[in-house]
Amino acid sequence: MACSDPEPAKEPVLSGVPTDSVCPAGSKLTYDSWGSTFFATYCTRCHSKTREGEQRNGAPDGYNWDDLNSVRAHQEQIDLMAAASIDVVNHEMPPSDPRPPTSERQKLGEWLACGAP
């Protein structure tokens, strides 16, 4: 999931803390209503199925956040690297601007806790 490493990593090194975010009753966050825009804004400049080789800036192959199935397969890693809750803010990703504010990272944690609908 590294975006600045010159060589693609085999597996990302996870350095964050689980957010233990919860899915609140009535959460309306979905990939279509929120997630796709979040990932397009902050992540897919590296984590995109349309990027290859050096265009991925070190993001491992298969870690494509413009593909909901890939996001769901890597929910734990995304939580550890980029999500937030009331008590925890992981900000390993993205490594450069634009970076999401804490409020958006908290929405990411909520959305992941809800199963990434």
Please tell me what each predicted stretch does.
Residues 3-117:
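Aromatic- and Gly/Pro-enriched helix-to-coil junctions and flexible linker segments
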